[in-house]
Amino acid sequence: PETRVKAFVDAHEEWIECALEKARVRRESTIFVTPEEAEVLRSKAKEVLIPRVYELAQQFGFKPCGVTIRHQKTRWGSCSARQTLSLNCQLMLLPEELRDYIIVHELCHLKHLNHGPAFWALVQKCLPNALTLRRELRTYIIQPLDNKHVHEELL
């Protein structure tokens, strides 16, 4: 099954790269993703996001126990009490700097499992432009999987 997924991703790499580039330049967006697109995104996210989590973790001194990639309906990411990060495959449709912001945000939850002042101070220490990135992230909306609506930027 993993070989088939990789072959599928490789066969659609040009489309994936094109979709990613269009998503990077678009700032105000509602993201509609079909189940088929979600599978492509999930595969690409595993290739891109998991290594990035560990790069940023090392850079800022965090040690996550694991990373999972899923299609989440309402969250860009989460961090469990077991020190595992879960990231939404739709992160692949965001600009890289926003993906990094979300990853760092979740990594900071490894030290503070809440959104208290100490948490936000740590996020700000890691990413001095965190407030700007947080505001920009609010212009993006996660949409549930929907067979009827495909975001025109992905076509």
Which role does the model predict for each range below?
Residues 1-101, 110-155:
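Active-site-proximal or metal-binding-adjacent scaffold patches in catalytic folds
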Residues 106:
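Walker B catalytic acidic pair
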